[in-house]
């Protein structure tokens, strides 16, 4: 063996030795339910740089590095979207390279519409020029959120809007911490999260406002993690790093949406599980009923101005309803991390929209699949990949079916004219004549 180690298996397995507990499905259970369907889908860094796509603000490519992989990634995403059959789709992790012919979102829509009939075709929502960063982008990150819709099924109501999310900027030495008598000053912190995209639609004279979100990840730390000596470890509450920063974003979202008229649906990758602070702030948190204190982040700015220097305590949530919890309880998931399943991708609604829920489904095409079957080949060698929706991303899409029945126009019945008798029965006038004749004979 020339001093090389080899593996000598002592037992062989076959396909029949595996126990399957999550059977694949060709489409979500709600794909044909309701009057309108909305989906949320994290598309795992869909970039089109390798086919001449426009640059994003950071100039970096987080997606496919060769054209073959990019085409495979796009094909898997398209096949998933076709099967979802949603009328509106919120996207996360799509390249933030504008809305032109060489943008990632145009590239995706072109490929998607090539598989559909005209009445099923999609367009993307574009923000107004005044809201674009550097006249082109949604915020300054390499990735962004996006929204697709079917104009044959749903109508735009006004222009799209951007909800800017907080940033955290703490200069070096702005804060101190102490442990075992040693006092330290913080390094500088500059943290960002994706802006949210808002679009109102008109459906049968009703308004539906959809908000697509992608909050700060749990991976990189914020100054609160440094202050608690967690910059290199897991925070004690197990909610991941930058939790207070995500709470700040949830507060901004809640404040921005609390007075919106009509139905409201908040979707996207919140990078927070269903019982964690950011979701609690958007839904049913009440400080008077618990000892758990929820705080926003410190050193935050919003639209370039100081937002919260010290952070603040949240007293009450914004009252949105977790549709997955309403329909299925806590037994839902859309993501797998270190073998543990949980729900990072949410659909939160106000009361009027929650009453319209027909069905909701996390379509498990990614979370329980091996990431070896994703588009990338860096670590998979000659492993055969397929164009199926399975392993199209690392997050499961969530699909929401809603009831928006078309109004029924009342029909006023047309009175039928009285028909002349042609035998078998006597009309009213004939009876009157007979009565008159009878009276005359008696006289």
For every predicted segment, state its role.
Residues 407-421:
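Ser/Thr/Gly/Pro-rich low-complexity, disordered linker/stalk segments of secreted
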Residues 6-408:
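Divalent cation-coordinating acidic motifs and surrounding scaffolds
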Residues 427-443:
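A cross-kingdom C-terminal cell-surface attachment/processing module
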Residues 419-429:
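Juxtamembrane/start-of-transmembrane alpha-helix segments at the extracytoplasmic/lumenal side
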